Each structure stands twice: as structure tokens, then as C-alpha cells.
């Protein structure tokens, strides 16, 4: 255990100030988003609106992110990561504040769409920023640590979201309590501006002026690299379809199936994120044993039994345990995938590569959000959620096997 901590401590000391500031920025933004994620669906229900509205808001948010990710990635490559992140954080914070106070269904949909647009600017620039400020040998550890810290910050946000809402409810109505919590979440998100403002970007070194059209240049100069981006995109689309059926509605699942309180829901989701953070540290160890591709696949496949346990159990305790392990195992491979992708593309198009990868994932959420709510409404609370979780397990299985077949052969070709 001492060797384990020493390894991570040694790694962290090698990171420059830009990386540490980026981590702080993501801590603040993830606390804010964690508070929103755990409570916002319930806010919509508290306004007296239906499950369909929740589905529409989630679909519009994801669709907006999918639409803007590639343009945001190109902007990040051409204008600089820091400028794009500052723009995204300030506007996202303001939009989140508006979402905390508006009640009209139309405004809920508009602000949900705007959230998807502006949060993408931070989202699309973070991984390329870390890649450009690190060495290849640092990246598996760095991306795992970054993801773990982000997840831990999300845990804090989820816990705050649940407990603050119940605390405020002691003094005011449920609706007002939720609204106060959401406003605090938006303030946390805006705090990310301050570490970003302190970052120092050397664009002359990282983003040469002669790189005018990264997308066309990349196709001409590195067709095999473009192939890698497309292959990653297909894998992410399959996982995104499965994720979009389940993940946006986990708070409603625990509320509807088990009548859990806001505090209990916040605690469960927070524990799931905490388990994910711990699993992130295990990722590099698995990579050393079996390689990057197999590590991703093994972690994803190991999550499936726990997903099905969550789907069919009638016990809140077992559902929570299944959720914790599914969450940890399924997400532990994400930083490994990011490291693998960043290692295969040029600096001038890292933002574009990352944006395409995230875009297709968001498309999965956009398309499957309304499908999920329709299935639950058609089959009822128990069988509706059970069917949704089962479909997700099937899509995860297909996505994992595809990743293994495609990238194992690609990795073998690279080694040759």
C-alpha cells in the first residue's frame, strides 16, 4: 500500500502548475454540476411537470452538447484552450443560475439547451489541455488522477445537493429548498473561473499559426489517425446509447422504485461516485497487467452483473450495492480510453478528436432519454426500469466486445 501511495505522490509532483490549476477548475465545476445532477430532475417534478419534460430537458441538453462539441473543439484548437474554457465557465455559470429560478416549461427547455452548449467548452478543452501540459508516460496516471478528483468533487456536490435540500426544507417549502441548493451549485460552478484565469498558455509552441484548418490537415497528414477517431466514435456511440437510457434517471429510479428521500438519493449517488474515484486509481495497475485495450474491456464487462442486479432487485440495499459497483467498474476505463486516444493524434487536433468522441456519446443521451421515459411509462415502475437497465446491459456488452475486437487488432498492427 505504501508503494502504491508513493507511486501516485511521485507522479503528482511531476505535474506543472497548469495541470494543477486545471484540476482545481474541474473540482469547482464538478461540485456545482454534482449538486445539479442529484436534484434538478426532482426540481422539475416539484414544479408539477411530468416525466416527459425531464426526458425532453435531458435530451435537449445532450443534443446541444453534441451539436456544439465539434465546433467547440475546433475553436479550442484555433483560439486556445484557456480562452475557450473561460468563455464556457462564465456563461455556463450564468445559465445554471437561470435554471435555478425559472419555472415555465419553455424556459426550462431553453436553459437546458443552453447548458449543453456552454458546458461543452470546458468539457472539450480539459483533456487536450492536460495532454499538452504532460508527457506521454505521465498520461495514464494523470488522466486517472484527474478523473478520480473530478469524480470525488462530484461526490461532494451530490452530497451537498441532497443534504442541503433537506436542511433548507426544515425552514421553507420543498420547492424553495431545491431552488436554494441549485443557486449554490451555480455559484460553485462560476468559481472555476479563477484557477482558469491563472493558467498560462504557450500557444506559439502548442498551436502553430500555420495550422489553419486542423480537420483537413489531419486527414491529409494522418489518415490512420483519423481512422482511430472514427473507431473510437463508434465505440462511444454504443456506450452512449446504453448510458442515456439509465444514467440521467438514476435519482428518479431510487425515488420511484424505493421512495428514497433526497438525502438518501444524494448519499447513494455520492457513494457511487466515490467508488468510481477509487476505481480510477486501480486503472493504471490493470493497464500494467493486461494493456490499455483489455483493461478497458475487462472493467466494462465486470460491471454488467451489477447493472442487472440493480435492475431486478426489490431491495434498496442491493440496488445501491449494484449501482456502486457498476458505476465504479464502468467508469474506471474512461481515463484509459482518453490516454489511448490522445496518444494517437497530433496536438493541433486534440480538441477536435476529444470533441468528436464526446459528441457521439452525447448523441446517445439525446436519442435515448425520451426512449427511457417512454418505456418506464409504458411498463410501470418495476418492469419499466428493469427493461431499461437490461437494454443498457446489452448495449454495453456489444460496445465492449466491439472495442476489444477493433482496438486489439489495431494495437497489434501498431506494434508490428
Question: In which residue ranges do the predicted regions lie?
Answer:
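Cytoplasmic helix-loop-helix junction between adjacent transmembrane helices
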Residues: 113-150
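Helix-to-loop junctions at the C-terminal end of transmembrane segments
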Residues: 68-80, 165, 279-292, 376-377
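A membrane-interface helix-boundary motif in multi-pass transporters
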Residues: 166-187, 376-396
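Hydrophobic core of transmembrane alpha-helices in multi-pass small-molecule transporters
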Residues: 27, 95, 106-122, 237, ...
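C-terminal membrane-cytosol helix-exit motif in multi-pass small-molecule transporters
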Residues: 186-206, 402-407
Amino acid at each position: 500500500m505504501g508503494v502504491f501511495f508513493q507511486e501516485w505522490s511521485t507522479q503528482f509532483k511531476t505535474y506543472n502548475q497548469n495541470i494543477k490549476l486545471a484540476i482545481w477548475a474541474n473540482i469547482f465545476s464538478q461540485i456545482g454540476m454534482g449538486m445539479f445532477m442529484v436534484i434538478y430532475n426532482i426540481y422539475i417534478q416539484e414544479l408539477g411537470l411530468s416525466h416527459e419534460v425531464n426526458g425532453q430537458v435531458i435530451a435537449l441538453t445532450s443534443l446541444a452538447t453534441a451539436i456544439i462539441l465539434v465546433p467547440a473543439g475546433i475553436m479550442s484548437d484555433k483560439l486556445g484552450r484557456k480562452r475557450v474554457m473561460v468563455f464556457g465557465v462564465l456563461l455556463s455559470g450564468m445559465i445554471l443560475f437561470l435554471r435555478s429560478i425559472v419555472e415555465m416549461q419553455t424556459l426550462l427547455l431553453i436553459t437546458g439547451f443552453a447548458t449543453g452548449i456552454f458546458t461543452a467548452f470546458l468539457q472539450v478543452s480539459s483533456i487536450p489541455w492536460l495532454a499538452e501540459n504532460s508527457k506521454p508516460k505521465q498520461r495514464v496516471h494523470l488522466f486517472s488522477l484527474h478523473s478520480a478528483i473530478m469524480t470525488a468533487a462530484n461526490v461532494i456536490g451530490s452530497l451537498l445537493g441532497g443534504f442541503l435540500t433537506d436542511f433548507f426544507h426544515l425552514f421553507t417549502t420543498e420547492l424553495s429548498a431545491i431552488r436554494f441548493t441549485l443557486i449554490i451549485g451555480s455559484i460553485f460552478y462560476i468559481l472555476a473561473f479563477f484557477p482558469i484565469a491563472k493558467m498560462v498558455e504557450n500557444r506559439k509552441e502548442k498551436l502553430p499559426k500555420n495550422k489553419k484548418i486542423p480537420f483537413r490537415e489531419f486527414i491529409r497528414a494522418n489518415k490512420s489517425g483519423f481512422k482511430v477517431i472514427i473507431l473510437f466514435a463508434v465505440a462511444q456511440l454504443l456506450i452512449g446509447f446504453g448510458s442515456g437510457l439509465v444514467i440521467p434517471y438514476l435519482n428518479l429510479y431510487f425515488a420511484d422504485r424505493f421512495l428514497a428521500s433526497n438525502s438518501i438519493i444524494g448519499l447513494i449517488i455520492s457513494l457511487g461516485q466515490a467508488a468510481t474515484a477509487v476505481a480510477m486509481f486501480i486503472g493504471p495497475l490493470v493497464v500494467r497487467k493486461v494493456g490499455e485495450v483489455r483493461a478497458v474491456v475487462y472493467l466494462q464487462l465486470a460491471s454488467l452483473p451489477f447493472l442487472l442486479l440493480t435492475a431486478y432487485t426489490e431491495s434498496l440495499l442491493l440496488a445501491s450495492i449494484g449501482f456502486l459497483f457498476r458505476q465504479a467498474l464502468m467508469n474506471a476505463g474512461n481515463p484509459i480510453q482518453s490516454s489511448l486516444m490522445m496518444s494517437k493524434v497530433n496536438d493541433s487536433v486534440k480538441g477536435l478528436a476529444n470533441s468528436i468522441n464526446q459528441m457521439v456519446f452525447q448523441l446517445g443521451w439525446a436519442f435515448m432519454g425520451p426512449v427511457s421515459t417512454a418505456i418506464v411509462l409504458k411498463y410501470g415502475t418495476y418492469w419499466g426500469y428493469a427493461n431499461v437497465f437490461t437494454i443498457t446491459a446489452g448495449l454495453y456488452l456489444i460496445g465492449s466486445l466491439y472495442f476489444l475486437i477493433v482496438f486489439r487488432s489495431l494495437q497489434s498492427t501498431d506494434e508490428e
